[in-house]
Amino acid sequence: MEELLREGKSVRQLVRESIDIARTAFELSLLAFVSGDESLCRAVLSAERQVRERELLVYVRNSLAVRSLDDAMMSVSIFQLEKNLSRITDAAADIAMSYLNFKPPLPRYQIVDGEEVIVKLPYKAGHGARLGRLLSETGVIVNVVALKREEKWILEPPLDTVLRDGDTVVAKGSIYAVERFAERIGARVPEPPRGGIVGEFFEIARIVSVMFFLSLSALLMNADWLAENVVELEGVMDEFHAKLENRIISSDLSATAKAALLSSTFALERISDSLNEIVTPVLEDLEPHPILMEIFEETKERISVIEIDEEDAGKTIEELGYHLKGVTVLAVKRGEEWLVMPPISAFRLEPGDVLIVKYFEESESFVEREETREDREEIIEEIWEEEEED
């Protein structure tokens, strides 16, 4: 806390860092649990304190900056976001502790499967290669979430990191992009968990992952309909959670495996509840704080918009090739209609469609070519105005 105070970081910087830490902690907690990696579990635990410290500082700095009732009302979105990012990180730590406490005798996997895959890969391409160079040589974009060297984990390693044989990297991206990256570093993408109770556990983890970025998108766009989708998914999550809970209890798994899975499932439920709370200001018609637009353009995984022009009209999302460049389409705004997670191989785009996209920091130059930052900000402001009129 004292170090953060000395650094004098702004609310914008603190919230941005909290988003990155919470997302990374959530994703790595799942990978740590399913792979049985104790050192990765401990890395997740360290994130809990980091976000809690930032939460307290956000309250202090934002309270000092409030000068009017309007300022206070806009600050609600910041407070709700930061409070629930802290809760999400706490729940991620509980998933890590579920493994550390119970050491469940479950099948081990080195991959978490979803809209994107998160996978542990051994580096075998020789000493001296820089991470950024390796990524550029593959022609695709993945996010290297973490790097393990000996017993130390480095979260979000910089692109100038020099890799060594024996390192372990955690990569995230589309399955095609991750396979290309794995091939370049002399590794192979393992099979993900399929079916069974562990497979069902990761089905609900996928729902939570979708909710994470939809809740941030709803906040950025001030979009009721996106917020309502988060609420609906939270209801789906409740149903899945109850069914999985019964399946775990009635299974023939060992007592420690049951305890670990139940504890982790409860943690996912808490994350789902927190994501639901993040969109509360939107549903209550409270104006979002203007710094949110800047925050979501600066995180490691960013959220913004791209408008479809005549050149790309008629193409499917898959034909745009975004999945190769680390870009995921979360939703499409077509006129007054919102479509969440449309099928990438079947949904055909029309001129004027606005894509709500999530992309890696490394994809910024690609997204900038598709839509300049200035144009993206104008599109978001127009959506804000439309949502306020509705």
Residue ranges of each PLM-predicted region?
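Cytosolic, long alpha-helical scaffolding segments
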Residues: 1-390
